[in-house]
Regions:
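Conserved, structured C-terminal
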Residues: 1-129
């Protein structure tokens, strides 16, 4: 994780809602956590690019069709999956796995795809005891 989590995001947007327990009767921030959980307008997604030279640094614009829908938060090379990887918050309606997005790299638009996580070994088949 890099710039994906800060004071402008919440755990539910970042896919970390499992780490928030709302079972206590009262605690500071409980009302805000409940509101955040029920009013999600965006979600953190993983975007991959087949071209390993398309490595985003962050802040690159993302468009779907002709509309800018977000900006890259962080990126890097996924050596194990042999793809470039980026993370971005996108409006909920654009977060479906398989959705194509265009990202601007140094003045050129390149197509990436929203992918399910984890990107590596999603079935946990490589874990060995």
């Amino acid at each position: 994780w890099a710039g994906e989590i800060n004071t402008e995001t919440n755990p539910y947007e970042a896919g970390l809602g499992f780490a928030v327990s709302l079972k206590k009767e009262k605690f500071h921030g409980k009302d805000a956590a409940i509101a955040a959980q029920s009013n999600l307008s965006r979600k953190l997604v993983a975007i991959t690019f087949d071209d390993m030279t398309c490595v985003p640094f962050g802040s690159e614009p993302i468009r779907i069709g002709s509309k800018i829908v977000g900006r890259i938060k962080s990126g890097g090379q996924g050596y194990t999956i042999k793809k470039a990887i980026a993370y971005a918050y996108l409006p909920i309606e654009h977060t479906g796995v398989g959705t194509s997005v265009d990202v601007e790299f140094f003045g050129n638009w390149r197509t990436g795809v929203i992918c399910a996580e984890p990107l590596f070994d999603p079935a946990n088949e490589r874990i060995r005891c």
